């Protein structure tokens, strides 16, 4: 991975009631950002550790990525994701860097379908802290109001 020349990436996080989201909480804007953050952060952490994946890690990453569709609440998104992942040659995904690159490639295929911007690998490296080896500069935290369950 190459060093970053993007002067750190900044972001903005806002809270929106799920009823205000396009297609509600189960549409792409409801579940997508958190799911992508989880996927990319895990892959970034493995890339930062460096080296080759163990056979167990390879199997676990393949299984997790292949089966993530079960967590996607949007039916058309789920089908599209399954189509993307079914076409992946996991045999060549043998390092953390390659896992990270794969997650960026998958995300960009989804972005293309949704007419969203393509994110370069270099920008993703900056966003998820592979350039500094410190991980993402920001995190997403969610705390549910559980008093409604009492």
From Swiss-Prot:
Superkingdom per UniProt: Viruses
UniProt keyword annotation of Membrane present = no
The record's disulfide annotation reads 74-77
Record's keyword terms, sorted: Disulfide bond, FAD, Flavoprotein, Oxidoreductase
Gene Ontology terms, MF aspect? thiol oxidase activity
What cofactor does its activity depend on? FAD
Database matches in PROSITE patterns: ERV_ALR
Q: Which EC number(s) are documented for this chain?
A: 1.8.3.2
Checking InterPro entries in the record gives: ERV/ALR_sulphydryl_oxid_sf (IPR036774), ERV/ALR_sulphydryl_oxidase (IPR017905)
The answer to whether keyword Disulfide bond applies is: yes
Enumerate the catalysed reactions.
Answer: 2 R'C(R)SH + O2 = R'C(R)S-S(R)CR' + H2O2
Q: Which residues are in the ERV/ALR sulfhydryl oxidase domain?
A: 24-128
Alphabetical list of SUPFAM superfamilies matching this protein: FAD-dependent thiol oxidase (SSF69000)
Function in brief = FAD-dependent sulfhydryl oxidase that catalyzes disulfide bond formation.
* Name by which UniProt lists this protein: Putative FAD-linked sulfhydryl oxidase 088R
Q: Where does this protein come from, organism-wise?
A: Frog virus 3 (isolate Goorha)
